[in-house]
């Protein structure tokens, strides 16, 4: 049974000086000393994402270990008092052996963990009882991080073993978010698509649905924001700041991970299966075609390359002139100036061309990296449908059933679709 030491807080229980002939400690003489592991940090995102999930059958994610340093008879009880992050937790057993380890499953307050948006400190009080007599108590001050900090890699400081947590990005994909339905209704009202049908038709319809999301975000003026670093001083844990669905929508800002999990949330909602594609320092989106054997790519950071919100009837002639030979031709621009093409059609057209560019731009590098996915650290191909077997949306962590991780997941990449169409005609 492996233990992730970088997340473990060790609580050592040791004996007083009074012993009997069997080297047992009298219950009243059992004392506790509290020591904290290297990290001394709680990551709410990790606790929420795996709250009801066993990530691997040979790994545990308990935060605390209790180690008994002496043999004791009687009924032993370890009590963790309630804090702002957890409910009172009690572990009991009959006697203890020297060196015995127990791992209390703390009763976390998942609603409070989900509300943690900035780092802080929390004091745990741990009390030891033998036969209902308090023997000792200690306070443990622990750091906690923002729920926006996604842990994606950890290193055991004692063994240098690396733990891959990239699947935790799936916890930020939330297909059940309450703001998705109003967002989809707004798209339909704009007329880019008349409804969302998932895979019920053909690949053209699938792409049109994805484009309608792209177009709406450009209409809202969503920009690229390279906010990825956190204030986490850890040398043993790699984490990245990830915005939730409502934060991207309300703040109209997204980095590569934000945009990818945002799109993935909507695609899952409308019945299109997304893929989180991770390479060192970057993430981009994939989504399956109707057959389920091939997939398209999408570079979500390119959304911010075109701000449709800033193009108005008053400045369109000036702004669109800058797009000649980039998103429009000279002939199309001249036709617009003459009133032969409407402003709405021009905006839809340049948005679609930017969408096709974002569809194409990663194809060649993706194919060249295909053998690295799943075999080289930080190259990961993560279908969200399969991620749901090991991690749930953070806001829904307490309502899902536990699943078991399969090491065979994420092996078959399938076939990436080739170059996209380049015409304004759709």
Task: Report residues per predicted region.
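C-terminal motif of bacterial Sec signal peptides marking the signal peptidase cleavage site
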Residues: 14-16
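A structural boundary/capping signal
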Residues: 20-426
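Short, linear, compositionally biased motifs with a strong N-terminal bias
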Residues: 10-11
């Amino acid at each position: 049974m492996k233990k992730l030491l970088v997340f473990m807080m060790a609580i050592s229980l040791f004996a007083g000086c009074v012993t009997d002939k069997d080297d047992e400690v009298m219950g009243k003489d059992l004392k506790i000393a509290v020591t904290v592991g290297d990290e001394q940090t709680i990551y709410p995102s990790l606790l929420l994402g795996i709250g009801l999930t066993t990530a691997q059958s040979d790994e545990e994610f308990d935060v605390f270990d209790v180690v008994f340093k002496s043999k004791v008879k009687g009924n032993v009880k370890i009590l963790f008092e309630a804090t702002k992050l957890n409910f009172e937790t009690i572990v009991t057993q009959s006697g203890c052996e020297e060196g015995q380890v127990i791992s209390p499953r703390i009763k976390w307050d998942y609603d409070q963990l989900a509300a943690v948006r900035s780092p802080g400190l929390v004091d745990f009080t741990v009390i030891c009882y033998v036969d209902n007599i308090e023997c000792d108590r200690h306070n443990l001050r622990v750091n906690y991080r923002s729920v926006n900090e996604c842990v994606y890699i950890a290193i055991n400081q004692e063994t240098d073993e690396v733990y891959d947590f990239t699947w935790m990005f799936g916890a930020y994909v939330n297909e059940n978010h309450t703001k998705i339905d109003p967002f989809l209704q707004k798209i339909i009202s704009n007329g880019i698509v008349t409804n969302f049908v998932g895979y019920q038709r053909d690949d053209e319809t699938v792409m049109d649905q994805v484009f309608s999301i792209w177009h709406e975000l450009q209409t809202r003026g969503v920009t690229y924001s390279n906010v990825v670093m956190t204030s986490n001083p850890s040398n043993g844990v790699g984490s990245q700041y990830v915005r939730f669905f409502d934060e991207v929508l309300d703040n109209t800002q997204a980095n590569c991970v934000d945009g990818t999990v945002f799109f993935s949330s909507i695609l899952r909602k409308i019945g299109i299966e997304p893929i989180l594609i991770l390479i060192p320092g970057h993430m981009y989106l994939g989504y399956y075609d109707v057959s389920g054997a091939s997939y398209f790519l999408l570079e979500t950071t390119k959304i911010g390359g075109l701000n449709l919100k800033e193009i108005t009837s008053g400045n369109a002639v000036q702004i669109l002139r800058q797009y000649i030979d980039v998103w429009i031709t000279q002939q199309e621009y001249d036709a617009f100036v003459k009133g032969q093409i409407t402003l709405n059609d021009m905006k839809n057209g340049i948005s679609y061309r930017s969408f096709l560019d974002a569809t194409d731009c990663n194809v060649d590098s993706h194919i060249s990296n295909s053998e690295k996915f799943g075999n080289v650290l930080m190259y990961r191909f993560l279908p969200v449908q399969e991620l749901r077997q090991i991690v749930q949306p953070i806001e829904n962590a307490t309502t899902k059933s536990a699943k078991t991780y399969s090491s065979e997941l994420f092996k078959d990449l399938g076939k990436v679709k080739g170059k996209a169409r380049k015409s304004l005609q759709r």
